[in-house]
Amino acid sequence: MFPYPSGAGLHVGHVRNFTIVDVLTRFYTQQQMNVLRPFGYDTFGLPAENYAIKTGISPQSATETNIHNFRKQLKRLGYAIDWSREINTSNPDYYRWTQWCFLQLYKKGLAYRKESYQWWCPVDQTVLANEQVENGHCWRCGTEVEKKKMKQWFFKITDYADELLADIDQLDWPDKIKTMQRNWIGRSEGAEIDFEVVDSKDFIKVFTTRPDTIFGATFLVLAPEHPLVSKLVNDDTKQKVDQYRTETLKKSEIERQENKEKTGVFTGSYAINPGTGEKIPIWVSDYVLMGYGEGAIMAVPAHDERDFEFANKFNLPVKQVIEKPEGSTDSDECYHGEGELINSGHFNGTRTEDAREQIVAWLHEQGIGEQKVTYRMRDWLISRQRYWGCPIPIAYDEDGNEYPIPEDQLPVIIPEVEDYKPDNTGRSALAKATDWLTFEMEVEDKKTGKKVKKTLTRETDTLDGYACSSWYLWRYVSPHDDKSAWNQEAISYWAPTDIYVGADHAVAHLLYIRFWCKFFADQGLLPFREPVKTLLYNGYINAPDGKKMSKSKGNVIDPLDVIDQGYGADTLRTYEMFIGPYDMDAAWDPKSVGGVYRFLNRCWNLCFGEERALASDSEGNLATTGASATSSPVTTGRARSVARGTEDKDRLCIRNKTIKKVTDDIHRHNFNTAVSATMEYVNELYKTGAEKEDLVTLAKLLKPFAPHLACEMLEKLDSDDVWPVWDEKYLVADTVELVVQVNGKLRAKITVSVDDLEDQEKIEKLALAEKNVQAFTKDGIKKVIYVKKAKLLNLVA
């Protein structure tokens, strides 16, 4: 429950997510549990800053307006939110503690600064976020962008890579989310090998998962950004390599990894293959990424598809070093499987599975290789050259030395500025706040170690918004605490989070909160190592045509429009739970909304004897509203005063079965079938007439989905809202329905006692007493098939 409060407000797709949480909140509250259901806003980010640049309206002002609109929508939807715990990441009382979290990571060496490439617009003279680059051009001015090296802040999430990966197995999360996190972390075991550069003192470090194939390495490929590239070129190759590097820096990593024709440039230099002692050429190509391993690969085209394609393109040698096993059906030109080594010196004949360890040991003896584990996941880049973000609590002296802001001087407040555009060096608009930018602070001099007063310059980068949302779950337990980020007694009582409902950021936010949880557990500040016990990953509500709702497409449906049309909040909430399994995408269907409205009217009519008229057009839109007096099954003869006996027992069976069904369905998060079971119960009450206890049960079962209607009913019935409990003895009915077939076709359904199921002769007599069965068995019965478990009697005539 931590949305970004956009100017567009909520649409009906958001309502599904929030209603799931509300259904569970009300359900467990009715079961008399203590339920924490707070709400907050993830308010930092580009949209508010871009809006400020465009309109001059400050992000602070625009954010407050948007939050007011969100709050209004949420209250209209009837959510049981504890508004006393409302939080907002751009409130200084909140981001004070985000800055404190940063400093804890900084103290332990897990927040650090290094150079990194960023998108840069040479005309606007500013850094661009990935989403601001459109087909290689600046979204504002259309200029072709380039990559520029800048100092950036990172969190060392890779220090926790092994634990983050290992603990995925214990999570009660959807398999697809766990798989995405495993793949994102991307643990690879292999070897790091040094390749000596010919006529140079340099070595190129290469990571490979297949050290057993080293004798088949016929060339090396470096990422164009590799720091050694500039030293490997010569006068003949420098221009081509520089041009290729420039073109590569315009591409995203996704574009570089797409299956397409390989490109590359020869550097002019060679390396020595430590296995064969042969000279092999060194190339650069964009299919090698700087972030994986060491940004360099040994290419074995006989046994790797991408290397094979590259070798074919540039006529490079292919050397087979694994013999394909006899009977292998692998028809690929390059063999990827296991087998015996060939053309591999004294390792010939060794199985590849054994050779990996033996070859690494051999390389280690020579001092040019060792076992290594690497990860696809990189350290988390957390600095942004934006105004509207949490200021990083770091300052610098004139020599560039870093000084953390003392905790008792937090928060570092975001200053008001007149111009929200970044300055012409790519720094954020914070750099223009000169009164804020420089200040005096007593620090320990880096050279002398003495306490001195220095004039310092504040960091003008701000934190990635994900930093603010990496700890909000713990702030909820004590949102007004001004002594700590979270109260230890409260965190022990309320956390970790039992149920988290969300549909995005599987490998961003959901990974980052796990990282921070483990870090703060190591500091003794959290009594658990995983932040969320159960994750529900809900599907989207799409537009009626199946397309995703978005403001740009003009297909957004405002929940308040649905409510004000006459359907009301209860209809909208119940429809969104009834539309299908919560984890599946669904298309908005106006006609079905009308159906749910009619169902709730039937519930009203059962209790109050008054059903609001509904006339709808072909699209399900309300044509008229109002009320038409109809008789209630409670207040007329339809609510028969039932004599004690079988009919009472049947009523109790139906009621208790419904209670169990709805309870189990909500526990299993099958919200759609819980609503369906309630609908079936209403149908039964219309058939039999409803007694007070039936209506009390109905109102209690309805309350998580349609709280407004349910509360009206419970007040009328003078009842509490405690969740009903079924009685096991009423789950088995005294009577059952038995199907009678003649020659395999349905001819009758008869009601028999459970005891009579044991008496086939009696069952046959009851069946033959049915006129329709008699009509089809005039010529006699040749054979009788009775299946007791299936409650089926088939007469062969």
Regions found by a protein language model. Name each.
Residues 1-57, 87-101, 208-209, 274-310, ...:
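N-terminal catalytic cores of NTP/NDP-binding nucleotidyl/phosphoryl-transfer enzymes
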Residues 200-201, 609-649, 653:
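Intrinsic disorder/low-complexity segments
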Residues 269-275, 279-292, 321, 435-440, ...:
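Alpha-helical recognition segments enriched in aromatics with Gly/Pro capping
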Residues 12, 98-318, 323, 422-439, ...:
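NTP-handling and nucleic-acid-processing catalytic cores
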